[in-house]
Amino acid sequence: MASIEPTSLERRPRALPVLGAHAQPPPRSVRISVTDRCDFACTYCRPSRSDGYVHERLPRDAWGPMFEGLRRAGVRRVRLTGGEPLIHPEIVGIVRELAAMKFDDLALTTNASQLARLAAPLRAAGLHRLNVSIDTLDPQRFRDVTRGGDLAEVLAGIDAAIAAGFTAIKLNTVVLRGVNDDELERLVTWAWERAMVPRLLEVMPIAEGAKLARTHLVTAAEMRARLAHLLLPDEARQDPGLGPAKYVRARRDPSLRVGFITGTSDTFCASCDRLRVSSTGALRPCLATEEGVDAAAAAVAGRPAEVEALVHAAWAQKPDGNVWKGCTEESASAVSMRAIGG
């Protein structure tokens, strides 16, 4: 197996685009990082387990005003992320609070290490949907990629989620050349056998991924070519309003699908309607930059109307066009994936 530690990228001379008025409608979707802590240290997210990172988290009672401000600003779809959101000691209460606000969609992305004990409580609290991140079905590879994770715990968590009544769980896999790209068919068929939706992600050129993308990138076109015997020759299609993945149907059963997320080869900036909230309460209009608006003080003070105004201010800063193409290694690596949830 090839090394999975990041290697250096040649610097590109272009600077990040200047932020300007965004032409899209107001944000309808938000990803909220409730914590920047994680029990894994995946190679495309963190440089090491002991990287000197100082963890920060918005106080629990500040999240209520934050959620209300987002709702007033027009957000209809919420996804909770991390770090690892299930590490937050009050994650079930957070889900219950959001569910009571009647958002159209309430989802959570997890590494599933804590899901065996939390799947049923999360379902009872009102969580609609789950995405599970899993990059390999080989236990040793899993330990290598996550720097110590236990695959058995993750698989038990997935089983618990299915038993709790979660359906159409999405299985997210970051495909890395020489690391797990020989498992594409195994991962896809494993997900289908469990009525899950496999989604294959190109490594994104940000954070540690900025260093990995040059040597470990497998494009969606290559992934699809390798899976051609399993898939219909359809045009890949997005689910409107439900994220950037483009789906292709299975030959054996057209109700089964594979999603491809092309964060590098064919970016999706133009159709993005997503705002991100960091674990410290910063409103981030774009994953690829550190630009944003700090809403922590307004949330801590219990002023949802002020949070609402700050949401609109942050959205006005959303870049137009293809930000990825302008990323240098230095600027892209400065983005902390763990604090904004990817």
What are these regions (language model features)?
Residues 60-80, 84-201:
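Radical SAM/AdoMet-radical enzyme domain recognition
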Residues 2-82, 86-105:
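Conserved alpha-helical substructure of the radical SAM core
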Residues 49-54, 138-145, 207-211, 294-295:
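A short acidic, helix-capping loop that chelates divalent metal ions and anchors anionic groups
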Residues 36-38, 46, 134-136, 202, ...:
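Short, small-residue-rich loop/turn micro-motifs
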Residues 2-30, 189-193, 200-342:
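Auxiliary Fe-S-binding modules of radical SAM enzymes
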Residues 35-37, 101, 125, 251-253, ...:
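A short, compositionally biased micro-patch
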Residues 41, 45, 140, 145, ...:
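Residues that scaffold the ATP/ADP-binding catalytic core of kinase and kinase-like folds
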Residues 40, 139-140, 267, 293:
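Glycine-centered loop/turn positions within well-structured domains
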